[in-house]
């Protein structure tokens, strides 16, 4: 019984340490960085983030707007309605241009905003893709070009500069976001099983908590038995 008791405690401690380390990696891998960005040519900001593994930046701009009306597309922010051609998408309403220069680790690349691709309660989002200087304003390569920049692992600082912004958006402040490497819907295969924590994290935490409660109850019963045995021995003497 004593061996089983201490083995169970050792297993609980090992599982707790393992889960804590996995959750720390999960928090880093799912870290979403964001900052307000004034849309004026020449505006600069430094975006701080952390990554568990190297990867390519996925940038987006979120605007405070009501959900889009697909019957009356917003000419400023654009609309995702498009026609697909060989190697590219042609958008009916691409939105006014936004180009950002991203600098990291001595390298830089220009990114171009696509039309509104998602929306939530009171906000809409435009995602960025590597710029194609010779492309028509309505055309975007599809699948998108591979990002020319690669972000390393650890704590990072990205310098962002507004290169171009359409007149209908100048002076507006939007939220610049840098997506994490590990996401619920889209993730890199290098993260392996860590993606499963999106689904099983609450269950694992609950099971470990129940295991701890059982061990505490078992320890209390063993302690009470030990004290009773000691008290009986004292009386007998």
For the regions a protein language model found, what residue spans apply to each?
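Extended low-complexity, serine/threonine- and proline-enriched intrinsically disordered segments
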Residues: 63, 71-119, 174-180
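Alpha-helical transmembrane signal-anchor/signal-peptide segments
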Residues: 23-44, 175-182
């Amino acid at each position: 019984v004593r061996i089983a008791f201490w083995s169970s405690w050792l297993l609980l401690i090992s599982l707790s340490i393992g889960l804590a380390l996995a959750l720390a990696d999960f928090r880093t891998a799912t870290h979403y960085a964001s900052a307000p960005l004034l849309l004026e040519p020449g505006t600069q900001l430094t975006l701080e983030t952390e990554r568990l593994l190297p990867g390519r930046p996925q940038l987006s701009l979120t605007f405070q707007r009501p959900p889009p009306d697909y019957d009356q597309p917003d000419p400023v922010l654009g609309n995702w309605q498009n026609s697909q051609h060989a190697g590219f998408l042609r958008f009916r309403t691409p939105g006014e241009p936004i180009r950002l220069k991203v600098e990291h680790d001595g390298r830089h690349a220009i990114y171009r905003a696509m039309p509104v691709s998602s929306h939530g309660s009171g906000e809409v989002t435009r995602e960025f893709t590597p710029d194609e200087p010779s492309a028509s304003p309505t055309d975007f390569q599809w699948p998108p070009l591979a990002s020319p920049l690669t972000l390393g692992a650890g704590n990072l600082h990205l310098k962002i500069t507004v290169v171009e912004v359409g007149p209908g958006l100048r002076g507006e402040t939007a939220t610049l976001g840098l997506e994490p490497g590990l996401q619920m819907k889209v993730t890199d295969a290098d993260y392996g099983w860590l993606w499963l924590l999106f689904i099983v994290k609450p269950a694992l935490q609950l099971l470990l908590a129940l295991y701890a409660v059982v061990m505490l109850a078992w320890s209390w019963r063993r302690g009470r038995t030990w004290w009773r045995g000691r008290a009986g021995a004292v009386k007998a003497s």
